[in-house]
Curated annotation (Swiss-Prot):
Alphabetical list of InterPro entries matching this protein: Ribosomal_bL35, Ribosomal_bL35-like, Ribosomal_bL35_CS, Ribosomal_bL35_sf
GO CC field: cytosolic large ribosomal subunit
Listed transmembrane segments: none
BP-aspect Gene Ontology terms: translation
Coiled coil: none
SUPFAM superfamilies (alphabetical): L35p-like
Keyword Ribosomal protein: yes
UniProt protein name: Large ribosomal subunit protein bL35
Native source species: Shewanella oneidensis (strain ATCC 700550 / JCM 31522 / CIP 106686 / LMG 19005 / NCIMB 14063 / MR-1)
Keywords: Ribonucleoprotein, Ribosomal protein
GO terms for MF: structural constituent of ribosome
Lineage of the species this protein comes from: Bacteria, Pseudomonadati, Pseudomonadota, Gammaproteobacteria, Alteromonadales
Pfam families documented for this protein: Ribosomal_L35p
Keyword Membrane: no
Length: 64
């Protein structure tokens, strides 16, 4: 049986940790002038993928 392929787009966006998969928050790429400093500061923090999405991410990262 051939090796399973890792989804490269998913590999670049998510990192496996002991508690699940770490991800970056959205809404911090452009149109930042109208967003408050507080909002942008909170968006800089990493967060975990929702529990319901973990199986799909894990399937795309077979060696994570």
């Amino acid at each position: 049986m051939p090796k399973m392929k890792t989804d490269r787009g998913v590999a670049k966006r998510f990192k496996k940790t002991a508690n699940g998969f770490k991800r970056k928050q959205a809404h911090l790429r452009h149109i930042l002038t109208k967003k408050s400093t507080k909002r942008k500061r909170h968006l800089r923090n990493k967060c975990l993928v929702a529990k319901v999405d973990v199986p799909a991410i894990a399937r795309q990262l077979p060696y994570a």
